[in-house]
Amino acid sequence: MSEWKIRFGTAGTSDSFTAMGYKNSLDIPAYTEKMGLDAFEYQCGHGVRLGLDKARQMADDAAARGILFSVHAPYYISASSLDEEKRLNSVNYLLQSAALCRALGGRRVIFHSGSCGRQSREAALEKALDTLKRAQDALDEAGFAEITLCPETMGKIGQLGTLEEVLALCGVDRRITPCIDFGHLNARTLGGIRSKADYAAILDRIGEALGDERARQFHVHFSRIEYSKGGEKRHWTFAETQFGPEPQPLMELLAERGLAPVIICESAGTQAEDAKTMKRFFEVCLCTTSQSGLRPPAPLVGGAFGIKRKLHPAAKASPTRGGGIPKG
């Protein structure tokens, strides 16, 4: 799996996993392949509990089937906490997640940065930037330099995780890659993603801030999400069309621009089925783009989407830095 390509997969397993007779984590690669998908995000929201030996078994099976794992780190990471001990613990949770990710043959660890709490957004971001720098240093020192940290955009307004905050975090090191959760962004902006142009503005901003490679190979979470005045309230399925955002305009843009993210569906109970729907949307869009005579753009250089904006000063990279789980 040396060649990078667009992938579609799930966060955890759909209700259909057990309905189809699959029983435990060792069955995940077979199930993922059966559903026509080629990515899987192993959920460690409540702690890194999967044994490394079992993870290596899963990795061998996944590699044979062309499936790429990623890992979602524990939810209780708090890179922005006022409590320094919690911030240091967050570094350890990321190290544990990186060890599991490597055992699974994966490349990416996705994580939530934390909340603002009783401090300003600016102060919370400063702490998160420092924690992330410590985490990247710790990964390098522990021999996990190939594992990519992916801070996620968040759905609740009180959480650290606007698009700009995540892009600032990615400025800590050129390897750090954003996890853009479009459902979360739609929820925290109270329905701000209404059109293809809204998606395009987000993609443009990623390219403007991060340049070519990360703008092309970023990480995606997608689901329809109900929201209230505080932002995210509940994940739904693609069948609940009263909740946004719509997936098809995003698939059109990915095809037209030649982008290749890993797309992880987080629908409630139908994530595999809905991921397959997105894959079909994308394949149709890709075919339409080809038949129309349009060609996806060549790889972009940094800043090609527009004028470069100045990154948060604490997010400047060091010049020495490089570029529902089943039981058991």
Question: Where are the model-predicted features located?
Answer:
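Gly/Pro-rich active-site loop or hairpin
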Residues: 19-22, 122, 160-164, 186-260
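Conserved beta-strand positions in the central sheet of alpha/beta enzyme cores
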Residues: 41, 70, 110, 179, ...
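Conserved, mostly hydrophobic/aromatic
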Residues: 32, 72, 90, 101, ...
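Active-site acidic/histidine proton-transfer and metal-coordination neighborhood
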Residues: 63, 80-180, 187
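Active-site beta-loop-alpha junctions enriched in small/polar residues
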Residues: 11-15, 43-47, 74-78, 114-116, ...
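Glycine-biased, low-complexity coil/linker segments
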Residues: 302-303, 321-324
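N-terminal pre-domain/capping segments
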Residues: 1-73, 77-98
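Acidic (Asp/Glu)-rich catalytic clusters
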Residues: 2-3, 29-34, 50-70, 96-105, ...
